[in-house]
């Protein structure tokens, strides 16, 4: 029987509780109150460092019953920095996450990257070599008013990869500005990418700007049937995300600055939030 691949991680944070690190998913829970101001981005420093197994990426997301939306982050293999969760307040007044009201999840997935000699329409090569997702640029100028949701239609079919499904995810750089992209499947007939501006300012995005990323998830990770190893909070109830079967191995030396030791990886290293540069 083939052994499960290992996700190496280090964790140290007095404000979060490591609730579970079972096969496939690591879960943290807040031990202290988190205040989210209206129309302001909130970042939660997790004190968590992680490296996916070969051929895998990592996905980071939050879940709560409170009126708070989490950015779903794609963690690239070359990212060596601390993981942080980006949260947006859905209301126009303060929201409070009391202890145990926020769960933070980290899980692995298998992916592939299409071979493209040149950019194809809005689909571009990633900024850093080895990144999980391809860059997707805006086909037109766009203005988003505060608390406005708009859709961007992309009609060009993405390159196909057998046994993999093209899926849209947001970028952490835009999420830090208050713009969240709703993850969704990119099908042959095109895709409508939904963007919501949670900030208090009108945000102008120029044509050709990178505004989301295209990730080819292995078809195993997309299911319409619920199981203990799936989550409806990532892609929605009609297409559940089922994480890869991996085990978690604690490696304290992964913590940047913990012992002065960090992995000398070329490329992304500590730039960005693990999903995209700012």
From Swiss-Prot:
Q: Name one GO molecular function term.
A: metal ion binding
**Classification via Pfam families:** dUTPase
Ligand binding (substrate): 76, 84, 171-173, 273-274
Known CDD domains for this protein? trimeric_dUTPase
What are the names of the required cofactors? Mg(2+)
GO BP annotations of the record are: dUTP metabolic process
Assigned keywords, A-Z: Disulfide bond, Hydrolase, Magnesium, Metal-binding, Nucleotide metabolism
Protein origin, superkingdom: Viruses
- Reactions catalysed, as given in the entry: dUTP + H2O = dUMP + diphosphate + H(+)
Record EC number: 3.6.1.23
- Subunit record text: Monomer.
What function does the entry list?
Involved in nucleotide metabolism: produces dUMP, the immediate precursor of thymidine nucleotides and decreases the intracellular concentration of dUTP to avoid uracil incorporation into viral DNA.
**To which protein family does this belong?**
Belongs to the dUTPase family.
Q: Please name the HAMAP family in this protein's record.
A: HSV_DUT (MF_04031)
What is the designated name of this protein? Deoxyuridine 5'-triphosphate nucleotidohydrolase
| Gene that encodes the chain | DUT
């Amino acid at each position: 029987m083939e052994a499960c691949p290992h996700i190496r991680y280090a964790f140290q944070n007095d404000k979060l509780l490591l609730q579970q690190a079972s096969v496939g998913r690591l879960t943290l829970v807040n031990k202290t109150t988190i205040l989210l101001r209206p129309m302001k981005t909130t970042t939660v420093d997790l004190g968590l460092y992680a490296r996916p197994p070969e051929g895998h990426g990592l996905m980071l997301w939050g879940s709560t019953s409170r009126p708070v939306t989490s950015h779903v982050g794609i963690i690239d293999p070359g990212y060596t920095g601390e993981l942080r969760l980006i949260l947006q307040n859905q209301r126009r007044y303060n929201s409070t996450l009391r202890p145990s009201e926020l769960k933070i999840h980290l899980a692995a997935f298998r992916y592939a990257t299409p071979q493209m000699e040149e950019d194809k329409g809005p689909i571009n090569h990633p900024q850093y070599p080895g990144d999980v997702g391809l860059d997707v640029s805006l086909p037109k100028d766009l203005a988003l008013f505060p608390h406005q949701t708009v859709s961007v239609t992309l009609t060009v079919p993405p390159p196909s990869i057998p046994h993999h499904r093209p899926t849209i995810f947001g970028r952490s750089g835009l999420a830090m500005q208050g713009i969240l992209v709703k993850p969704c499947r990119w099908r042959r007939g095109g895709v409508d990418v939904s963007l919501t501006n949670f900030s208090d300012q009108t945000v102008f995005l120029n044509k050709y700007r990178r505004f989301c990323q295209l990730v080819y998830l292995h078809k195993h990770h997309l299911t319409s049937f619920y199981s203990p190893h799936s989550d409806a909070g990532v892609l929605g109830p009609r297409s559940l995300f089922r994480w890869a079967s991996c085990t978690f191995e604690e490696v304290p030396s992964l913590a940047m600055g913990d012992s002065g030791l960090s992995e000398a990886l070329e490329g992304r290293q500590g730039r960005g939030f693990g999903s995209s540069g700012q």
